């Protein structure tokens, strides 16, 4: 161990063992009694397949006794046989770090998968198992990070150097939202970004790579993937690979790093698979008993220090839309901001489908965001909360039974609900609307005008899928013009019809 508590990443003389048993991605290896490898050490062996010889990497997970260790494979074990020689590398999995990885696509082992040759200038390799920063090294500075997305900036602001969770069930827009955040922040911020795909679709990774290359931000981004089709060991460790690369930029280069992780649920799911393969007794709902420890080991490394910061955005799949499921529930405790995606809003075509009442942030405080921002956010939430309370009455008795004051609140809430929608740059091909990046000052001012009732006379449709209040006014003028044209056309048709009858 070096003085900072991490392994130095330099290989030591390790022992040589032989494969005893292969059970899918789990491999048992026997070593000489005086050469038993440590937990988390990386082992390598050669496999002969029809495609030729390649190296398989294993990670030690258990010491079984009788000179045997149980390991998990980082890639397919097809072609592996009993008796194959296994080399202990004498260190954990170590991945390349530094500016050489920017613009590259890597796997869990730090090997390039973008067919652009080896990573050049590998000046350093860091082990993926490292301790979290010490308490005295952490930064406590609270500052807002502008995302350009109105509903997030206003109601659940992002803390610079904090952690944001994007919670949602299947198909409600988590990946689209995280891709838009990458587009907005990477383009505006022009800093270093690290994207880690954990157990998600290969298609999405390919699309993201193409979009980043087209936008010109790939040169400042490292992409690390452990996709759906890979063994659980790769999906379980790829998150640590991404964090390790981000830590180098923070600790050595002193940078403010953006860390995107899609999807943290797949990390828990892969850990569940590994735990079952190890023969451990599951806990509630079938999850591994070590879920909290594993999540904490990852999350506590994603933090800000006095040297630099890591601002992370994590997509969190919510199984069956149940937020009490142990996997998303375990993530909650580590976050500074939670962005809840609502299936109900998604069905109403409010995009992004962020639930303004369920979402929250620890920095939505007058001392951090300012008094005006805080007051506007609370007024918006208050109006939407009252609208939610009135919906049952409206459904049973109708809106006409409400008091005049409540009718005004309902109308204003519906405008606010639509105004929280926004056209995305990454969804332009689907909406045919140009994307909008809304500055924080414009967001606060626009919503202040709406909650004060300055635009109660404008149609609800004018507030839908627009940027700031100027876009609302422009859309209202267009709608008014279209309505007048429609009335004139109707009059002309009526006149032609009357003339035809007269003849």
From Swiss-Prot:
Gene3D superfamilies, sorted: 2.40.10.170, Bovine Mitochondrial F1-atpase, Atp Synthase Beta Chain, Chain D, domain 3 (1.10.1140.10), P-loop containing nucleotide triphosphate hydrolases (3.40.50.300)
Enzymatic reactions: ATP + H2O + 4 H(+)(in) = ADP + phosphate + 5 H(+)(out)
Subcellular location field: Cell membrane
GO terms assigned for molecular function: ATP binding; ATP hydrolysis activity; proton-transporting ATP synthase activity, rotational mechanism
Membrane topology: Peripheral membrane protein
Enzyme class: translocase
GO CC terms, sorted: plasma membrane; proton-transporting ATP synthase complex
Keyword ATP-binding included in the entry's annotation: yes
Span of the signal peptide: none
Transmembrane feature ranges: none
Family classification: Belongs to the ATPase alpha/beta chains family.
Protein name listed in UniProt: ATP synthase subunit beta
Organism in which the protein naturally occurs: Rubrobacter xylanophilus (strain DSM 9941 / JCM 11954 / NBRC 16129 / PRD-1)
């Amino acid at each position: 161990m070096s003085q900072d508590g991490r392994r130095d990443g330099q290989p030591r003389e390790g022992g040589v063992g032989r494969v005893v048993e292969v059970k899918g991605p789990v491999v048992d290896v026997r070593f000489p009694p005086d050469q038993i490898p440590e937990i988390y050490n990386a082992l390598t062996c050669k496999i002969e397949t029809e495609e030729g010889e390649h190296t398989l990497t294993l990670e030690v997970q258990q010491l079984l006794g009788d000179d045997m260790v149980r390991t998990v494979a980082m890639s397919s074990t097809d072609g592996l046989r009993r008796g194959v020689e296994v080399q202990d590398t004498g260190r954990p999995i170590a991945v390349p770090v530094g500016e050489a990885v920017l613009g590259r696509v890597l796997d869990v082992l730090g090997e390039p998968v973008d067919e652009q040759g080896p990573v050049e200038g590998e000046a350093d390799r860091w082990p993926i198992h490292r301790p979290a920063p010490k308490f005295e090294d952490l930064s406590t500075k609270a500052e807002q990070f502008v995302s350009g997305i109105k509903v997030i900036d206003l109601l659940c602001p992002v803390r610079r150097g904090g952690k944001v969770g994007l919670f949602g069930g299947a198909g409600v827009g988590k990946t689209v939202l995280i891709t838009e955040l990458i587009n907005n922040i990477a383009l505006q911020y022009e800093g270093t970004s690290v994207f880690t795909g954990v157990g998600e679709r290969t298609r999405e990774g390919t699309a993201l790579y193409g979009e980043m290359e087209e936008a010109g931000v790939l040169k400042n981004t490292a992409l690390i993937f452990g996709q759906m089709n890979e063994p659980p060991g790769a999906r379980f460790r790829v998150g640590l690979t991404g964090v390790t690369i981000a830590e180098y930029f923070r600790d050595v280069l002193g940078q403010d790093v953006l860390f995107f992780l899609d999807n943290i649920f797949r990390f828990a799911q892969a850990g569940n698979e590994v735990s079952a393969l190890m023969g451990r007794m599951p806990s509630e709902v079938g999850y591994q008993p070590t879920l909290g420890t594993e999540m904490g080991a990852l999350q506590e490394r994603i933090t800000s220090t006095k040297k630099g910061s890591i601002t992370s955005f994590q997509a969190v799949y919510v199984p069956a839309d149940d937020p009490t499921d142990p996997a998303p529930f375990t993530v909650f405790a580590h976050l500074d901001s939670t962005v809840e995606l609502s299936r109900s809003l998604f069905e109403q075509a409010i995009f992004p489908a962020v639930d303004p009442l369920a979402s929250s942030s620890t920095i939505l405080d007058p001392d951090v965001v300012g008094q005006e921002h805080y007051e506007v956010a609370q007024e918006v939430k208050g109006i939407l909360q009252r609208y939610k309370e009135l919906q049952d009455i409206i459904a049973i008795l109708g809106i006409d039974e409400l008091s005049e004051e409540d009718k005004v609140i309902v109308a204003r809430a519906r405008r606010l609900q639509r105004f929280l929608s926004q056209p995305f740059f990454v969804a332009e091909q689907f909406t045919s609307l140009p994307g909008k990046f809304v500055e924080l000052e414009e967001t606060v001012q626009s919503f202040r005008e709406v909650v004060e009732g300055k635009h109660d006379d404008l149609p609800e449709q004018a507030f839908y899928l627009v940027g700031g209040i100027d876009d609302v006014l422009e859309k209202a003028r267009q709608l008014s013009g279209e309505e007048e044209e429609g009335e004139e056309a109707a009059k002309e048709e009526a006149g032609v019809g009357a003339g035809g009858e007269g003849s």
